[in-house]
Amino acid sequence: MMNEHSIDTDNRKANNALYLFIIIGLIPLLCIFVVYYKTPDALLLRKIATSTENLPSITSSYNPLMTKVMDIYCKTAPFLALILYILTFKIRKLINNTDRNTVLRSCLLSPLVYAAIVYLFCFRNFELTTAGRPVRLMATNDATLLLFYIGLYSIIFFTTYITLFTPVTAFKLLKKRQ
């Protein structure tokens, strides 16, 4: 049986890895923004956008090149979350017990919520300038577009990571009860 201090230490290590991975994951978005800001007609960005033009994406007609490349990069968030999951699988420990109904509900509902999020953000075309007022206002400024894509990447990353841990957590909780 592990004591509380070692559980806290292990979870702190897993959380530090989580913070490091999300920062590493967001750096390319900042690089895309800087490259576009310095040279709006950058060959690298154009090449990425044209080679992925058939993929569905969330773009803004105000800035189609930068938003296309940022959206394509946001589609890589599940892969980085999977790598993090593999690295922190044995480190992260459970803190408290929950009842069996909550565990089963989370096992059934979290994949459905994740599937809806991934479908909406990764497999549909969406024009930001035709959305509701707050999003439409964000879509007309490069800095707010960067914030939008940072949020999008973070949402996809964290929901993937949480969804990957749900069955493991359920298994550990149910195993602990027996």
Swiss-Prot record:
| Cytoplasm found in the keyword field | no
Species the sequence originates in: Citrobacter freundii
Per its UniProt record, what InterPro entries does this chain match? Colicin_im
Topological relation to the membrane, as annotated: Multi-pass membrane protein
Q: Give a GO molecular function annotation for the protein.
A: toxic substance binding
Q: What is this protein called?
A: Colicin-A immunity protein
TM annotation in the entry: 14-37, 69-89, 106-123, 143-165
Enumerate the UniProt keywords alphabetically. Bacteriocin immunity, Cell inner membrane, Cell membrane, Membrane, Plasmid, Transmembrane, Transmembrane helix
Asked whether the UniProt record includes Cell inner membrane among its keywords, one would answer yes
- State the taxonomy lineage: Bacteria, Pseudomonadati, Pseudomonadota, Gammaproteobacteria, Enterobacterales
Gene Ontology cellular component terms for the protein in this record: plasma membrane
User: Which cysteines share a disulfide bond?
Assistant: none
Q: Could you list which ranges are Cytoplasmic topological domains?
A: 1-13, 90-105, 166-178
The residues exposed to the Periplasmic compartment are: 38-68, 124-142
Q: Which compartments does it reside in?
A: Cell inner membrane
